[in-house]
């Protein structure tokens, strides 16, 4: 972690580590209210960056919104892969780590199904898991999750299609997080800068004697530093899993074609029948809506909902729109489906 951010606190909602395997940890957040919905919620974050964007600070926390509405909430922390993890595959993550974590959640809760909330590429893992283990998934919520990668609406898609991923993985083994971060920044540098600094610019007009405004200004700066910390915290990527994801999804578009294979099993999105909530950000510069919208027609779920919010890729988790509309929609959608 870069030294300037070492003292910046993030992810402060109390939790306990209830399972770990290799670098992966399963975090169980402590409840904030007595009345709990029976079905536990398991947030599956992406490999890129860190899970605590879902709990950046108390007033910008998807996790706290879930807890305050009575949801028993867990999240996966993928940790920081090292050289001995270079050969991990998507099968290791889905049928290994995720499956073991869900078994532990079911053991602790006494409930035989969980609600999955998949975030970005963690949503792809959640889709794959729901196909392979439908008996363990009560509800499926995905945020900013791509399924149709055949689009030129994002530079990320264009670059990934032309990437020599074999050369990259064969050379590095573990794809460096710093390299990933540079690539993601240059997908849309102007929007990324605006998103990062907007919270600070909102408070630069304080009068010297306006104590309340100056306190808010200080909190805006702290929010900015937390975002900087998160944006600089980039784990490396297990080479073989990264190779498979880039080739199968971005370059061959196998997921939406129902031709992706995990451990000898075909991933057919039509096998998804549980209730589905598909959420996306209108101004997402990484995962264009055109990549996420086809999911609802690709699954067999009779109970399925789609929502698009006027925010960006990160704003959907920490922005004003997230706290005002996105989180309430998730919790209200889940309540009648969590018993």
Task: Please place each PLM-identified region on the residue numbering.
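Short, surface-exposed "cap/lid" segments of acyl-processing enzymes
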Residues: 4, 11-13, 17-82
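Alpha/beta-hydrolase active-site loop
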Residues: 88-108
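Acidic catalytic loop of the alpha/beta-hydrolase fold
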Residues: 253, 283-287
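Catalytic histidine-centered segment of alpha/beta-hydrolase-like enzymes
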Residues: 306, 311-325
């Amino acid at each position: 972690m870069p030294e300037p951010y070492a003292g910046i606190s993030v992810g402060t909602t109390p939790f306990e580590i209830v399972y770990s395997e290799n670098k992966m940890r399963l975090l169980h957040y402590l409840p904030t209210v007595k009345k709990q919905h029976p079905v536990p919620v398991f947030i599956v974050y992406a490999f890129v960056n860190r899970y605590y964007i879902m709990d950046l600070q108390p007033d910008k926390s998807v996790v706290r919104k879930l807890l305050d509405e009575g949801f028993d909430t867990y999240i996966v922390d993928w940790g920081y892969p090292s050289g001995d993890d270079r050969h991990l595959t998507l099968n290791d993550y889905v049928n290994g780590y995720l499956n073991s974590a869900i078994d532990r959640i079911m053991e602790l809760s006494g409930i035989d199904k969980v609600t999955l909330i998949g975030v970005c590429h963690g949503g792809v893992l959640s889709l794959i898991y729901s196909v392979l283990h439908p008996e363990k998934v009560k509800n499926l919520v995905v945020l900013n999750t791509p399924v149709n990668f055949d689009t030129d609406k994002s530079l990320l898609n264009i670059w990934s299609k032309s990437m020599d991923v074999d050369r990259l993985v064969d050379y590095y083994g573990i794809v460096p997080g710093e390299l990933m971060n540079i690539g993601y920044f240059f997908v849309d540098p102007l929007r990324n800068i605006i998103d990062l600094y907007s919270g600070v610019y909102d408070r630069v007009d304080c009068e010297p004697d306006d104590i309340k405004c100056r306190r808010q200004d200080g909190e805006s700066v702290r929010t900015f530093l937390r975002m900087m910390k998160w944006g600089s915290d980039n784990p490396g990527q297990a080479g073989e899993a990264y190779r498979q994801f880039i080739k199968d999804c971005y370059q061959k578009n196998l997921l939406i074609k129902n031709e992706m294979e995990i451990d000898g099993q075909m991933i057919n999105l039509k096998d998804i029948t549980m209730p589905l909530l598909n959420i996306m950000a209108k101004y997402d510069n990484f995962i264009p809506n055109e990549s996420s919208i086809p999911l609802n027609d690709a699954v067999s779920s009779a109970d399925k909902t789609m929502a698009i919010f006027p925010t960006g890729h990160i704003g959907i988790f920490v922005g004003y729109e997230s706290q005002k509309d996105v989180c309430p929609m998730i919790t209200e959608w889940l309540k009648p489906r969590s018993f």
